[in-house]
């Protein structure tokens, strides 16, 4: 059993340009998380387990004037999200394989005190099974299948389902210094084209603390129920004509004693994005034309710096452009994350972490309002 509460005063989400956020009403955030896990071993080979998690969030939001559509930094509206996640799993382990049969249930509810924003309820049901088999001295293959049904339960009932089969394989060679991974997946959708995707990767240890890695993969991201069917009283709506995103990506990296540098490159065809009409201010999701390109470098360091104290730093430089070679909206070129964890006091965990978001723009091609250029600090104390 576990429980966690995050409560922060925050700052105004719509501070006028050139003004200081402290002059306006704070937009706070509260997150309550409760989780429960139970398991029973029938014998050494058979086990059943279940889990339940509740995530309840409350966010102060700043809305718009219903007549002029001007930002209202002192708006007192509240948005709430309540997620229920449940799982039931049966496991059988024998000398050949580990087999799992499972079901997952997810319910997402969204509500708001703003009369123009209707409630939303979405449900995902999943049933699946997989078998993992060790072979040779240090290789493993996993074969499985699953079924998912996605439902919109508010106002109108809309749904689609997904059936999939998949296989993944890992091989280790030369005293486990070479790790080769492969994965293949076939998805059959009720409302979208069927698709086969895959991934291959390799990691090579030069010495114990130094390794090189490379990965290549394809992806197929279908629109969510929310992106397809949501609507509000402001004129914003989902788009039932959205097409899935098709991605091709690769990355190469080097790591030494907790320090790593990774270059990544992703191409996304039919990227799903949000578009606002500049005249009516009503918006909807759409597929961007052509192929969008996201590439960049991540530099990270994670290690124990003194006894019981761990430092975590990362910097990401991102170039995100659409098919017209224009910078994509709402994506910061520079981002920096930092954190310090201390475990030296029995049963306690102390953490300080933060994130810096660099310059970004509200619309493509560096147009619209300039946002970003802010830092958020967090402090966490856990007792176990």
Language model features: what each stretch is:
Residues 4, 8-9, 93-112, 205-213, ...:
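Membrane-embedded beta-barrel scaffold of Gram-negative outer-membrane proteins
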Residues 36, 86-88, 127-129, 165-167, ...:
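Membrane-embedded beta-strands of outer-membrane beta-barrel proteins
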Residues 2, 39-41, 131, 203, ...:
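Conserved C-terminal beta-signal and adjacent last beta-strands/turns
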Residues 1-79, 359:
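Periplasmic-side early beta-strands and strand-to-turn transitions of outer-membrane beta-barrels
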Residues 137-142, 172-174, 180, 267, ...:
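Gram-negative outer-membrane beta-barrel transporters
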